[in-house]
Amino acid sequence: MKFAEHLSAHITPEWRKQYIQYEAFKDMLYSAQDQAPSVEVTDEDTVKRYFAKFEEKFFQTCEKELAKINTFYSEKLAEAQRRFATLQNELQSSLDVQKESSGVTTLRQRRKPVFHLSHEERVQHRNIKDLKLAFSEFYLSLILLQNYQNLNFTGFRKILKKHDKILETSRGADWRVIHVEVAPFYTCKKINQLISETEAVVTNELEDGDRQKAMKRLRVPPLGAAQPAPAWTTFRVGLFCGIFIVLNITLVFAAVFKLETDRTVWPLIRIYRGGFLLIEFLFLLGINTYGWRQAGVNHVLIFELNPRNNLSHQHLFEIAGFLGILWCLSLLACFFAPISIIPIYVYPLALYGFMVFFLINPTKTFYYKSRFWLLKLLFRVFTAPFHKVGFADFWLADQLNSLSVILMDLEYMICFYSFELKWDESKGLLPNDPQEPEFCHKYSYGVRAIVQCIPAWLRFIQCLRRYRDTRRAFPHLVNAGKYSTTFFTVTFAALYSTHEEQNHSDTVVFFYLWVFFCIISSCYTLIWDLKMDWGLFDKNAGENTFLREEIVYPQKAYYYCAIIEDVILRFAWTIQISITATFKPHVGNIIATVFAPLEVFRRFVWNFFRLENEHLNNCGEFRAVRDISVAPLNADDQTLLEQMMDQEDGVRNRQKNRSWKYNQSISLRRPRLASQSKARDTKVLIEDTDDEANT
C-alpha cells in the first residue's frame, strides 16, 4: 500500500485538516518537475535558480505544516494531561468514599451482588463502572494521538525522501534532521508515559492487579479502514439475500395463482406492510453505515457507540436478510393456509412474536450488546422529558417519524384481531365480501390519529426538553414548532374523513384546512431539512454552490440529487390527497402502501447528510472520542456545551470561539494512587509548543 493510501486509511477523521498535507506536497514536487526548464533549452544557471526558488517555497510550506502539527499536538497533549488528572481525581474520590463506607482498600474485596447493595453502594458501583468506561475512552484518545504523532513523522520522512529523489539532492534529509527530528511533536514522549500510567491505573485500581483483564478492557480497535467481516458473516449475508430474492419471486407467483378474486387482501397487506418497512429500514441502514465508513463520517462517535464492539453494515444486512426470509415464509404460509392444519391468523402472530423476542431476548446471544443499546435508547426516547437528549435520542425519534406507518399498522392489527377476525374461518385474514364495511376503520379512527402523532410528539417533547436545558428558543422551540404542525395535519385529516363518512356539510372546510396545514408542514420540514439538518445553502459555500463550505462526499451531484429527492417526497402527499378525494378509499390505500417505502428511502438519504453535518461539527471541535465523566457538569458548563453543539455555523466559528483557551494555564493536583509512588502537581501551558510541564 502506498503511503498516501495508508495515511488516508489511518487518520482520525475529525483531525483530518491537522495532518500533514501529503498529497499537496506530492503535487508540488511533480508540478515543479514537469514545469522545470530543460537544460537543453536554457542554461544550467537558470535551471538552478528555478529549483532554488522552488525549494525555498517548498521548505516554507514544510515549516507551516510543521508549526501546525506542533501546535495541534501540544494542545491535544495538554488536553490529555488535564483529562488524566481529572480522571485520577474522580477515581481517588471513589476510592476514598469506599474506604470510608466499607473500610476496604481495593474495589474488588466486596463481592456482594448489585441487587443486595444499599443505595449508596449502588451509586458507588455505578461510579466505578463509569470510571472504567471513561478510562477506556481516554486510553483510546491517547492511542489516536500517538498514531497522529507517528503518521506525521512518517509523512515528513516520506515526502522529504521523495523531494531528494526527484531533485537529486540531500537537502530534504538535512532539513528533516534539523527541523523534524527535533520538533516537539516528535521528541515529546509524554504520550507514551500517559499510556503507561493509564494502563497501570486501570490494572491496579480498577481490575485488582489483573493486567490481562485490564488490557482487554483497554483494547483499541484497528485504526484504519473497516476490517473485513468474518467469512461466515459474509457467507450468511449472501445466502440470506439470495433466499430472500427467490422467496419474493415465489410470493409474486403465489399471489397471482393462489389468491381468490372474491376476497379482499387489505387486512393481509396492512398486517404485513409494517414488517416489510422494518426490513427495508434495516437494509438501508446497513447501506448508510457502509457509506459513512467509506466517506470517513465517524458514526460510531456520533452515536456514542462502543468503538470496540458495534454492528457493521454486514451485520445489519445479515439481520435484514434473516428477518426478510421469515417475513416471506410467513406470508407464503398465509397463501397456502387452506392446505395446512395451522390457521392463517397464527402466522402473523408467530412472525411478529419472534421479532419481539429477538429484540428483548435476555440471553447474551444474537448481538446482545447492540440489542441492549437499542432498548435503552428506545426507553430514553419514550421517556424524553425526564432525560437530557443526545444526538442518538433525537436521531432515533426522527426515524420513528418516517416509520409511523408501522405503528398505525400495529394498531390496525390489534383492532382487526380483536373485532374483525373470524376465528372459525380458515381464511380469516382474507374476508369474503370486499364490500363489507371495515369495523376497525370506523371504530379506531380517533385511536389511529393518536398513534400517528406519537413519533411527532416524541420529537416535540425532546425539543422542549432541550430548550429547558439550554434556554435557547432557537433552534429548539422553532424545531418544536415544526413537529407541532403534524398534530394539526393529522387532526384535520381525521376530521375530514370522519365528516365525509357521515356526509356532513362542513366536510369541505376540513379538507381545505387539511391541505393548508400539509403545505405549511411540508415547507417547514423541507427548509429545516436543507438548512438546519443538512447545513446546506450556506452563504459562504464558495465553489460548492447552494451547498456548504466543506463537503465530505466526493460528488456534488449527490447533494443536488438529494435536494431534488427531498423536495419531491416531502410534497408526495399531494398525489395521495388528490387520489383519495377523487377515487375509492382502497385506491388511496394503494398509494399509501407505495409511498410508505418511499418515505423510508427519503429518511435513508436524509441520514447520509444529517450525519455528515454532525461529523463536520465534531471536526470543528476536533472531537474524536466520547466525553465521559463521573462528575456531572454544572449548569453553566452544560449550557455552554449545548450552545456550541447547536451553533448553525459551528464548523467555522467554533475554532474562533476556542481562542480563549490558548492563554490559560491550569494547575491540577493528581491524587496519590497505589499505582504511583508520589503525588505530583502538573501545570499545563497550552500555548507552549515544547510540551514541557513542570512536575
Curated annotation (Swiss-Prot):
Residues 2-224 form the SPX domain. Keywords: Cell membrane, Host cell receptor for virus entry, Membrane, Phosphoprotein, Receptor, Transmembrane, Transmembrane helix. PROSITE patterns: EXS (PS51380), SPX (PS51382). The keyword ATP-binding does not apply. GO terms for biological process: intracellular phosphate ion homeostasis; phosphate ion transmembrane transport; response to virus. The modification Phosphothreonine is found at residue 689. It is found in: Cell membrane. Pfam families: EXS, SPX. It is a multi-pass membrane protein. Signal peptide: none annotated. Residues 366-383 dip into the membrane without crossing it. Homodimer. Belongs to the SYG1 (TC 2.A.94) family. Inorganic ion transporter that mediates phosphate ion export across plasma membrane. Plays a major role in phosphate homeostasis, preventing intracellular phosphate accumulation and possible calcium phosphate precipitation, ultimately preserving calcium signaling. Binds inositol hexakisphosphate (Ins6P) and similar inositol polyphosphates, such as 5-diphospho-inositol pentakisphosphate (5-InsP7), which are important intracellular signaling molecules involved in regulation of phosphate flux. (Microbial infection) Receptor for xenotropic and polytropic murine leukemia (X- and P-MLV) retroviruses. Confers susceptibility to X- or P-MLV infection in vitro. This is Solute carrier family 53 member 1. It comes from Mus musculus (Mouse).
